[in-house]
UniProtKB/Swiss-Prot annotation:
Membrane topology summary: Multi-pass membrane protein
Annotated Gene Ontology cellular component terms: ATP-binding cassette (ABC) transporter complex
Alphabetized CDD domains for the sequence: TM_PBP2 (cd06261)
Organism of provenance: Rhizobium johnstonii (strain DSM 114642 / LMG 32736 / 3841) (Rhizobium leguminosarum bv. viciae)
Molecular function GO labels: transmembrane transporter activity
Residue ranges of domain ABC transmembrane type-1 in the record: 96-388
Protein name: General L-amino acid transport system permease protein AapQ
Family assignment from sequence similarity: Belongs to the binding-protein-dependent transport system permease family. HisMQ subfamily.
Regions crossing the membrane: 29-49, 100-120, 142-162, 188-208, 225-245, 264-284, 340-360, 367-387
Gene3D superfamilies per the UniProt record, alphabetical: MetI-like
Length: 400
């Protein structure tokens, strides 16, 4: 009885190689990544092709050439010159600048209020702690749009008419058309004042770093705060005087029926600014409170044992350590405030969304306008995140 020899040589076919590769985690991971990219590219191509076909079918022009067209509408509040004869592109720029104005001023104000309320919630004073708690619970549980309507319809709209404006210090007037204040008029000498201010800020930073290294090496403190204040205030003021006071003010004057002169901040911006600031501050207050609670209690007890005043313990020991806990969630609140500024359309403030909506209605370029909205808000979010990540890295605890 004869036995046939069995060929045990491995098969080297394509199917065999593919099956073998799929059992290797490295090649399997590469395959899944390539497959995912192919699917995403195919989906994007399908969306683009389908959009192009539908636009062609409806005889709708595409592209961003419409931005050179005449706007044909006015914008109530603008940081740059704008008229109805300006282009759509300039109108969008006005909207972007107004959005940035709301975001920057709102973030700054909300941070200050949030820190004060957060620290106040931990106060040993029963009344202060309870008032701060009520503030947080009220604003945190109300939709931001309702807060905006409260300030716009419930506070600013019931102010007196312009002829009965409420007089405020520094020649300012408050009425239902907004806040009128003196308009600064700059002369050419203000350029030198600005340069002096930049030099003073840079010098203050250099001195602060030198003082930090000096204290780490010798233990001797240096009054950097008062030095910085003296530089930042004193040097520009000296240049301002030497330049012949290159700044005047156009002061608003109360007339029989209206105010003349000066500048006016409309009630729409004031409502949006106040609403977003107070609303976001309630969330920041909880972040601050949680960050302070996250600092070991022994740190404050040790500082108190050294004879530091409670306010000094909070300022010098607790808050610097709490910042490492506070900064990451604080970034989310800054992003939320920036995106919530799009609610300005509800009260007629000309932010990016409101201006873009007007342009969309006139031009019909819906896809392009939506793309501009997305790109602008995405860019603002990325820039905010990058800055906060950099700041978080600077505040991180460096181990030796």
């Amino acid at each position: 009885m004869t036995h046939e020899a069995v060929d045990t040589t491995p098969l080297h076919g394509t199917g065999w190689s593919f099956r073998s590769a799929m059992y290797d985690p490295k090649y399997r991971s590469i395959f899944y990544q390539i497959l995912t990219i192919v699917i995403l590219v195919g989906f994007v191509w399908w969306v683009a092709h389908n959009t192009a076909v539908n636009l062609a079918r409806s005889n709708t022009a595409s592209g961003f050439g419409f931005l050179r067209g005449r706007a044909g509408f006015e914008i109530g509040q603008s940081l740059i010159t704008f008229s109805s004869d300006s282009t759509y592109a300039r109108a969008l720029l006005v909207g972007i600048l107004n959005t940035l104005l709301v975001a920057v001023t709102g973030i700054f104000t909300a941070t200050i209020i949030g820190f004060l309320i957060g620290i106040g919630r931990l106060s040993r004073n029963w009344l202060i702690a309870k008032l701060c708690t009520v503030y947080v619970e009220v604003f945190r549980n109300i939709p931001p749009l309702l807060v905006i309507f409260f300030w716009y319809l419930g506070v600013l709209s019931v102010l007196p008419q312009p002829r009965e404006s409420v007089g405020l210090p520094f020649s300012m007037y408050l009425n239902n058309r907004g806040l009128a204040f003196p308009k600064p008029i700059f002369d050419t000498g203000m350029i030198a004042v600005g340069i002096a201010l930049v030099i003073a800020i840079v010098a203050s930073i250099i001195i602060a770093r030198w003082a930090h290294k000096r204290q780490a090496a010798t233990g001797q403190p240096f009054h950097t705060v008062w030095t910085a204040i003296a530089l930042i205030v004193g040097l520009p003021l000296l240049v301002f005087v030497v330049s012949g006071f290159p700044l005047t003010f156009d002061v608003p004057v109360a007339g029989k029926f209206n105010l003349t002169g000066g500048s006016v901040v409309g009630p729409e911006f004031m409502s949006l600014f106040l609403a977003l600031s107070f609303y976001t501050a309630s969330f920041i207050a909880e972040i601050v409170r949680g960050g302070i609670r996250g600092v070991p209690k022994g740190q404050s007890e040790a500082a108190g044992a050294l004879g530091l005043h409670p306010s000094s313990v909070t300022r010098l020991v607790v808050v610097p350590q709490a910042l490492r806990i506070i900064i990451p969630p604080l970034t989310s609140q800054y992003l939320n405030l920036t995106k919530n500024s799009s609610l300005a359309i509800a009260i007629g403030f000309s932010d990016l969304v409101a201006v873009g909506g007007t342009i969309l209605n006139q031009s019909g370029q819906a896809i392009e306008i939506v793309c501009i909205w997305g790109i602008v808000y995405l860019s603002l979010s990325i820039l905010t995140s990058l800055f906060m990540n950099w700041f978080n890295a600077k505040m991180a605890l460096v181990e030796r």
